[in-house]
C-alpha cells in the first residue's frame, strides 16, 4: 500500500464530502470504524488486496481513551505505507449554521446540553489527532466544489479529466463502460494477411500496413478531431473519466493500432490511460 490518508476534524466540517472526493480519485474509503480497529483492518487489506490508496474517516465516536492511543495507531499504520492526516476545521458559527440547516444532531449531543458545548468539547477530544495533521483545511464558507479543489491541491493531484482509450473486439461484446464507441471494422484487416496475423496493432508491420491505408488515416483524423473538440467541454463538466472504446472484429489489430495512435496524439495535453481488452485472446 503506497498511501494512507486519515480524514478527520470537527463534525460538520466536511469529512464525508472529503471522503467522497477521495473515493472519486480512486481511494478505497472506510468511515466510522473504531480507532483501535484500524491497524488490524489495514493490515488485513494490505495482505489480501492490491490497494495503493486508502482513506480512513475518524471522528469523535471513538472514545477519549481511543483518541489518547492515536500515536500508537498512527505508528502501526506507518508499517503499511505513507500516512498523512487531513484535519478539517470550521468556525463555530458556520458549524452551528450547518447543523441547523441539516437538522442532524451533533455526535456528542447526548453528553452536552448545547451545540456550542459539543463543538468545544469535540475540539479537545481531537487534539491528539490534530497534533499529527499534515494537511489542515479550513472549510468555513467553502462549498463541496471548493473543498475538492483544495484537496487536489494539497495532495498534489490533478483535477484533469482522465481519458481512457480502450480497444475491443466486437465478437467478444461491446464494452458496457464506454462513453463513446467507434467502429473500425471497415478498415483493411491485417488478420487476412498470413504474415501479419500473429502480430498486434502495437507491432511495426501492422502499423505500416494500416498507415498505408487512406481510410485508416482519415478515420484517425476524424476521431482525433472529435476528441480534441469535445474533451475540453467534458472536462469543464467536472467529469473524472471519459472512456473512448475503439472496436474491430477481434480486438487485436485495427482497434489496437487506432488506440495506440490516438494515445500518442493526445497524451501531451491529456492524462491518457490505455486498455487493450482482448489482449488475452491475441494469437
Swiss-Prot record:
Keywords: ATP-binding, GTP-binding, Nucleotide-binding. GTP binds at residues 59-62. Pfam families: PapZ_C (PF22740), RapZ-like_N (PF03668). One of its GO terms (molecular function) is GTP binding. ATP binds at residues 9-16. This is Nucleotide-binding protein A1S_0588. Displays ATPase and GTPase activities. It comes from Acinetobacter baumannii (strain ATCC 17978 / DSM 105126 / CIP 53.77 / LMG 1025 / NCDC KC755 / 5377).
